[in-house]
Curated annotation (Swiss-Prot):
CDD domains: DeoC. It holds the Pfam family DeoC. This is Deoxyribose-phosphate aldolase. Gene3D superfamilies: Aldolase class I. It comes from Methanothermobacter thermautotrophicus (strain ATCC 29096 / DSM 1053 / JCM 10044 / NBRC 100330 / Delta H). Belongs to the DeoC/FbaB aldolase family. DeoC type 1 subfamily. Catalyzes a reversible aldol reaction between acetaldehyde and D-glyceraldehyde 3-phosphate to generate 2-deoxy-D-ribose 5-phosphate.
Length: 224
């Protein structure tokens, strides 16, 4: 099983996707997000599709990757729409994509639609795709199946949550289950409710190799 050995704050920062996907995020908010991402050495700046171009311009020439959410937050767009959204995000400068899978299809046992939903984005994007399972909605059996479909469809990561609308975010138990299911061949991103250093390190110890959070600065500043 993948287990990250984080010994410095710089190593921790390199695992963090610094995130602002708020509906009311202003250009000033995105500028601040990108400044912080560069200053602290975060892995990605995660934004909504409308802010990808701005973030890409701000981060040009840096080591920070722009990541766009797709099908966010509910995952209810059709596969064709998600694929188009992903393609446009990459054209505008995204180097990674975090997509919300079709949760209703997963709950209905419609494996074919879930696969088509994910593989369409993977093919259209041509960059690493992280599949948001929204674990709060799923049984353990469904979490395992969603991980296996994501792996089969060519995704680079499985991700716990959007944490949107008050839903529960990442748990250590879910991260452990996801890591056990995908093995060493995929990444596992923990996201949702990770607001302090202790929680971030617990997720990494459970098997996460990426952390999604809007409080990356506070997490890193907590390192002493």
């Amino acid at each position: 099983m993948v287990k990250m050995n984080v010994e410095t704050r710089e190593e921790l920062a390199s695992l963090i996707d610094h995130t602002n996907v708020r509906a009311d995020a202003t250009e000033n908010d995105i500028e601040r997000l990108c400044r912080e991402a560069v200053s602290y050495g975060f892995r990605c700046a995660v934004v909504t599709p409308t802010n990808v171009r701005l973030a890409a311009e701000l981060l040009e020439g840096t080591d920070v990757t722009v990541c766009s959410v797709v099908g966010f937050p509910a995952g209810v767009s059709t596969p064709r729409v998600k694929a188009l959204e992903a393609s446009e995000a990459v054209e505008n400068g995204a180097g990674e994509v975090d997509m919300v899978m079709n949760i209703g299809a997963m709950k209905s046992g419609n494996r074919e639609l879930v696969y088509r939903d994910i593989s369409g984005v993977v093919d259209a994007a041509g960059v690493p795709v992280k599949v948001i399972l929204e674990t709060a909605y799923l049984t353990d059996k469904e979490k395992v199946e969603a991980c296996l479909i994501s792996k089969e469809a060519g995704a680079a990561f499985v991700k716990t949550s959007t944490a949107y609308g008050g839903l529960a975010g990442a748990t250590v138990e879910d991260v452990m289950l996801m890591r056990k299911t995908v093995g060493d061949e995929m990444g596992v991103k923990a996201s949702g409710g990770i607001r302090d250093l202790e929680t971030a390190l617990a997720m990494i110890d459970a098997g996460a190799d990426r952390i999604g959070t809007s409080t990356g600065v506070q997490i890193i500043e907590g390192w002493r």
